[in-house]
Amino acid sequence: MFRGTSAITLDSKNRITIPTKYREELFADCQGKMVCTVDIQHPCLLLYPLPEWEEIELKLCNLSSMNPQERLLQQVILGNASDCEMDKNGRLLINGPLRQHASLEKNVMLVGQLKKFEIWHDTAWQSQMLQGISKIQSGEIELTERLLDLSL
């Protein structure tokens, strides 16, 4: 399970380094094989261990290619999916179109989301957090029944 945020860097060869605390689990669970794709709701990337990604692929495969909305989702998510394999030092190459989608430069945030990671430009992540907290505090975000039942 992946949680928390880690400030990492994109090196001159367009690689990120997965923090040490996650590497052992990733090598044990998926031999460091991962898949990265675009997030369709935010300017960030989604990075999945291969077994988690395979579950997503099955769900996408079950969508109808004859339904325009479902086909578009398949095209965007699958069309941007890129296999990534961690090297022994925990580095992953992020390809150009993916870097462009998330406007990645040197300073990057790796955000644990339990079964996957989000990869953000550092200032975009900070802005997202500030806006999100502000919307919650101001009541702009209506809490659903499920959220009201959540006790933190």
UniProtKB/Swiss-Prot annotation:
GO terms of biological process kind: negative regulation of DNA-templated transcription initiation
MF annotations from Gene Ontology: DNA-binding transcription factor activity; transcription cis-regulatory region binding
A GO CC annotation given for this chain: nucleoid
CDD domains listed in its UniProt record: MraZ_C, MraZ_N
Subcellular location(s) of the protein: Cytoplasm, Nucleoid
Pfam families tied to this protein: MraZ
Keywords from the UniProt entry: Cytoplasm, DNA-binding, Repeat, Transcription, Transcription regulation
Regions that span the bilayer: none
SpoVT-AbrB domain location: 5-52, 81-124
InterPro entries associated with the record: MraZ, MraZ_C, MraZ_dom, MraZ_N, MraZ_sf, SpoVT-AbrB_dom, SpoVT-AbrB_sf
Similarity comment: Belongs to the MraZ family.
Quaternary structure note: Forms oligomers.
Name assigned to this protein: Transcriptional regulator MraZ
Native organism: Colwellia psychrerythraea (strain 34H / ATCC BAA-681)
Gene symbol of the encoding locus: mraZ
